[in-house]
């Protein structure tokens, strides 16, 4: 007997995330919203945000909804190698947390392409582009995305991008939400396991692990060139056309 495919939707705050309001009869087991994205759909099940996210901007959960912050996601991110290698921004943190918490077969992203152009950078107007802040862990967003996709792969999970904007800092295969029921027909990225092994070995050897998750307090201990080598290994693990 074939088990049910567990699918998770992660919604970010990009301008196009509002397209998710039009989606009907969703077959996701959980809908995870990042920061303010809980405002997009009332049927979200999990709201995730950093510990410094303003209390007055957090949602009020009903009996079918739960709130999650650093007291949970630090453990999840550490399980998969820690923040320095994974990238210290919520788009990636939410993915690792969902992978750890739900052990799904499919994770779909929307509104998380991390492209900030024009006056309206978020669905609610102009916001802070957190992934573009000065941070050694975020110098190559494509590489951090490739890492998440590769780590999901070895955990028997596919990651897809439901956004339809032409530019993205995510490596995930773009699909139409109407095609999710025919996942076997989608031409997914090819994953190179030998490259994954090399990247994981390099991470272990480098040893940039901060147990409490507060990596920014030890930023001076991390060498840009070492992180770049690791990032390039992760990029090489995903076979796709990438515009850097």
Question: Where is each model-derived feature located?
Answer:
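Metal-ion/cofactor- or nucleotide/acyl-coenzyme-handling active-site neighborhoods
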Residues: 1-244
